[in-house]
Amino acid sequence: MDLFEYQAKELFAKHNVPTTPGRVTESAEDAKAIAEEIGKPVMVKAQVKVGGRGKAGGVKYAATPEDALTHAQNILGLDIKGHIVKKLLVAEASDIAEEYYISFLLDRANRTYLAMCSVEGGMEIEEVAATKPERLAKVPVDAVKGVDEAFAREIAEKGHLPAEVLDAAAVTIAKLWEVFVKEDATLVEVNPLVRTPDDQILALDGKVTLDANADFRQPGHAEFEDKDATDPLELKAKENDLNYVKLDGAVGIIGNGAGLVMSTLDVVAYAGEKHGGVKPANFLDIGGGASAEVMAAGLDVILNDSQVKSVFVNVFGGITACDAVANGIVKALEILGDEANKPLVVRLDGNNVEEGRRILSEANHPLVIQADTMDSGADKAAELANK
């Protein structure tokens, strides 16, 4: 889960990472009031989960509360790379002597953690990596040893931070590592990490991505979920513990196992080339259990997608046998009743497939069309979606 900047800074404050005071608001008048309360020049910052806010006009300096009001009025509702600004962070402006970059992330290729540090902060880190790679340090982090202040100082030194700030930077970097580990993050990034004229080290910005797989031990993270920004179908799927990702096609997909579902997406996309360019509408993995309740929940999500014209159910029976899957489909259609109003192409294979096909045949549901193979099922689903 990606966090807004203000949420990242809430975690920073929790772990004593120094930053600038401020508050979030959805109102231009409140932005003015916050600026008056701070009593100093402020930054008015769009809260969107995408980079490039400054270039898009989403970050403005306000010398007075009236300036904050004007900037807030202009920024709210702004479209930044497809993200509409609904919230603003009004934070005390800071004098900046130098800007640095620091992040902790997963290094999946090497199966470890990675610290990245650079004296070239305040600009896109991809640009630094491309134009000044020698100025960007990439330091592997031992998962057991972690990052204490001594190792944090090494990271800062390798990032070419000035000698006079190494000790102060090390304290903040070690605290950012604490955020990364204790909050189960997959990314903690500060750009810029700044030195002020009086040699304070402050995290002026913050980007944090939390690992959803750790939600069971991080109950407090639920408050960070932005339901307004989450697709309602994805939200419904999550409430039913379904692995669902909405796409932009017309063929709804249900399968058991991520690998099979990914293959199904490819086969449907290929078949769709013959039927007007039809594409998959979603990724939906129901996992190992295809009970009536699970199948009904999956179909309920997909059938509520107005873009879906047909559904392809592609299941390989393993631990869950095909007869159980077939019974699940039949009962799911009973549960949904009139809400099930789009054709379902069903391909079953694997454990007890003949019994599963018999159950579907005897049910004789008008919406269900059986397919013998994945290719024929994908072709039929694409054909139906193109009608």
Curated annotation (Swiss-Prot):
Q: What Pfam families does the record tag this protein with?
A: ATP-grasp_2 (PF08442), Ligase_CoA (PF00549)
Q: Which residues bind ATP?
A: K45, G52, R53, G54, S94, E99
Q: Which UniProt keywords apply?
A: ATP-binding, Ligase, Magnesium, Metal-binding, Nucleotide-binding, Tricarboxylic acid cycle
Pathway(s) annotated for this protein in UniProt: Carbohydrate metabolism; tricarboxylic acid cycle; succinate from succinyl-CoA (ligase route): step 1/1
Give me the residues that bind substrate, please. N256, G318, I319, T320
Membrane-spanning segments: none
Summarize the subunit comment.
Heterotetramer of two alpha and two beta subunits.
Q: What is this protein called?
A: Succinate--CoA ligase [ADP-forming] subunit beta
